[in-house]
């Protein structure tokens, strides 16, 4: 799948004029071969499976020529569809937060890194937690989410060491 901008760029790069490119895009849209909203939903599912944050997904879609508003709306629709597919429409945790929020996903990634580090018998020192933070930042999580996750992971680690 491609976005309208990507198709226009490809056609212009290969010698088609502005008018021909617009006609081709209009025809592709008419036959439903080209749909930026559907593209956003599919890209959201792909990017979430990779652990990316919503903000990063919106930026990546904007780079592909999708308006940020369309991207956010499509992401919200895709999230609702995913909840319905899982039979969790309206599901929320104790605090009323959606179960698919960025903090929960970031926490899963951090916990996985801690678990792998523990299984490999390696120390979980400040250097390690800095690496977790960089990983989360690379996935596009905001600093508040990262600090919150790191604080919880550090506290869990202190509690674990105190128990042993």
Locate the predicted segments by residue.
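An alpha-helical, amphipathic repeat domain used for nucleic-acid recognition
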Residues: 1-164
């Amino acid at each position: 799948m491609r976005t309208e901008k990507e198709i226009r760029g490809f056609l212009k790069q290969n010698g088609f004029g502005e008018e021909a490119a617009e006609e081709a895009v209009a025809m592709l849209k008419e036959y439903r071969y080209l749909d930026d909203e559907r593209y956003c939903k599919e890209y959201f599912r792909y990017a979430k499976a990779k652990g990316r944050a919503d903000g990063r997904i919106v930026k990546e879609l904007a780079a592909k020529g999708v308006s940020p508003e369309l991207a956010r709306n499509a992401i919200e629709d895709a999230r609702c569809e995913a909840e319905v597919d899982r039979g969790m429409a309206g599901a929320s945790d104790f605090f009323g937060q959606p179960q698919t929020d960025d903090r929960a996903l970031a926490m899963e990634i951090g916990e996985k890194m801690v678990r792998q580090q523990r299984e490999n018998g390696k120390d979980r020192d400040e250097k390690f937690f800095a690496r977790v933070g960089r990983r989360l930042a690379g996935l596009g999580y905001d600093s508040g989410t990262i600090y919150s996750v790191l604080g919880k992971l550090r506290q869990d680690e202190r509690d674990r060491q105190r128990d042993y």
